């Protein structure tokens, strides 16, 4: 298994002495769709900020494609790892969406033709090209999130990290973001998402990491999401499909999406 990310005994203290991460160790497979789960305060956002060097470990290390993040390679790491913040207003600052998405490529000192190519491809990938001259503050939340993703895509990273991308979105907005994430993964990118939405995680993810109190309590494939006891012990609610089918697990199995649920029920009823 080729690894995109390796976290080894990662410990992090905030300046006030609060320990946010406590000996965290896990791996993320290359080209996976990985979810980072945990209740509020579990350490998810703090962990994600280590993946492109915005935070520096107090102890331990983070490896990206086998290379330990350090001061010498941090610029190269940030080309490989793109981070999308939970609140797009923390990321969008230029007068237009076009200028915002162009900011990263411009700092790479690319020529104008290459910058335009990257910006156009990134905005079209999130269906925002027609809104390229619009100011960010004139966008809906879903549009802002897509614009923030475009800003990351313009850097052409191999790993895309998103902190709570589904937060506060309506169902249509969630579907749009999910489609973008699936397309990125189909293109060969490793996609890492923190979320509280375990129903969405069960359907979307193929790799799962669960945090509690700054520690990893579970890591592996999505079968973790069918372990209701584990989830609830760590402050998480089991997915609805797990609750509905857990009493019949031995006979019917637990589906990971509505399509599988329908197939199971048809076999059981007919």
Curated annotation (Swiss-Prot):
InterPro entries: AAA+_ATPase, ABC_transporter-like_ATP-bd, ABC_transporter-like_CS, ABC_transpr_CbiO/EcfA_su, Co_trans_ATP-bd, ECF_ABC_transporter_ATP-bd, P-loop_NTPase. It is a peripheral membrane protein. GO terms for biological process: cobalt ion transport. One of its GO terms (molecular function) is ATP hydrolysis activity. Pfam families: ABC_tran. SUPFAM superfamilies: P-loop containing nucleoside triphosphate hydrolases. It comes from the Bacteria. It is an enzyme of class 7 (translocase). Its EC number is 7.-.-.-. SMART domains: AAA. PROSITE patterns: ABC_TRANSPORTER_1, ABC_TRANSPORTER_2, CBIO. Keywords: ATP-binding, Cell membrane, Membrane, Nucleotide-binding, Translocase, Transport. ATP binds at residues 38-45. GO terms for cellular component: ATP-binding cassette (ABC) transporter complex. Transmembrane segments: none annotated. It is found in: Cell membrane. Residues 5-238 form the ABC transporter domain. Belongs to the ABC transporter superfamily. Energy-coupling factor EcfA family. ATP-binding (A) component of a common energy-coupling factor (ECF) ABC-transporter complex. Unlike classic ABC transporters this ECF transporter provides the energy necessary to transport a number of different substrates. This is Energy-coupling factor transporter ATP-binding protein EcfA. The lineage of its organism: Bacteria, Bacillati, Bacillota, Clostridia, Thermoanaerobacterales.
